[in-house]
């Protein structure tokens, strides 16, 4: 369901597994330090939504097809893994609505 970017702790996978089954961490599927385009390609191929704290993923630069996948951008600076997991769980329905969409972007929290 979700592909957690390496700027978020791998520990979150177990915390949110019940709500978001099939969630994986980047380091476990494409390796630490993988370029964003590799992460995006993996997400597209496996129907995953990228969860990241990297603002670059929000920008869909015309002609740059390398980051074409659905993204949840976490706008919580200097936060704990528990803070991110709570944010994701509290926004479960919004996140699950991204499935089946094309190039959807969701920034959380939305306020």
Roles of regions detected by a PLM:
Residues 1-10, 14-20, 31, 37-40, ...:
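Acidic, PIN/NYN-like endoribonuclease modules and their adjacent C-terminal/linker elements
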Residues 25-30:
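Short, flexible loop segments at the rims of nucleotide/cofactor-binding pockets, characterized by
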């Amino acid at each position: 369901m979700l592909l957690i970017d390496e700027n978020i702790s791998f520990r979150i996978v177990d915390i949110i597994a019940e709500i978001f089954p099939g969630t994986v961490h980047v380091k476990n599927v494409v390796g630490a330090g993988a370029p964003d385009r590799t992460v995006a390609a993996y997400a597209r191929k496996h129907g995953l939504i990228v969860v990241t704290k990297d603002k670059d993923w929000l920008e869909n630069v015309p002609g740059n097809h390398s980051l074409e996948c659905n993204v949840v951008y976490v706008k919580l600076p200097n936060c704990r893994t528990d803070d991110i997991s709570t944010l994701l769980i509290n926004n479960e329905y919004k996140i699950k609505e991204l499935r089946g969409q094309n190039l959807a972007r969701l920034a959380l929290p939305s306020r």
